[in-house]
From Swiss-Prot:
Belongs to the universal ribosomal protein uL24 family. One of two assembly initiator proteins, it binds directly to the 5'-end of the 23S rRNA, where it nucleates assembly of the 50S subunit. One of the proteins that surrounds the polypeptide exit tunnel on the outside of the subunit. This is Large ribosomal subunit protein uL24. It comes from Nitrosospira multiformis (strain ATCC 25196 / NCIMB 11849 / C 71). The gene is rplX. Transmembrane segments: none annotated. It holds the Pfam family ribosomal_L24.
Length: 105
């Protein structure tokens, strides 16, 4: 079971975007994730008349290491670690380490 999943609210804990919050858009194996609004790059795109692209400078989100992000805990309003807890009827579920609240309710 993966600790970080698509749709999780995360906070960057290291790197040039330290302190920024965003939502996970994509999880790329083995240890990269794309977070909305974090690690933005400018790409110079060539026009393509077949697809209808006008070209120009396009800003896009680029992948960031999983080790540089932590899940955001709304109860404590801080970055938190993820643990696993066994729940009857559901099996293993993710939880916050600080207050043992379930993430996937």
């Amino acid at each position: 079971m993966s600790k970080i999943k698509k749709g999780d609210d995360v906070i960057v804990i290291a790197g040039k975007d330290k302190g920024k919050r965003g939502t996970v858009l994509r999880v790329m194996k083995p240890d990269l994730v794309v977070v909305e609004g974090v690690n933005r790059l400018k790409k110079h795109q060539r026009p393509n008349p077949n697809k209808g692209d006008t070209g120009g400078i396009v800003e896009m989100d680029s992948p960031i290491q999983v080790s540089n992000i932590a899940i955001y805990n709304p109860a404590t309003r801080k970055a938190d670690r993820i643990g696993f807890k066994t729940v009857e009827g559901k099996g293993k579920a993710r939880c916050f380490r600080s207050n043992e609240e379930l993430i996937d309710a």
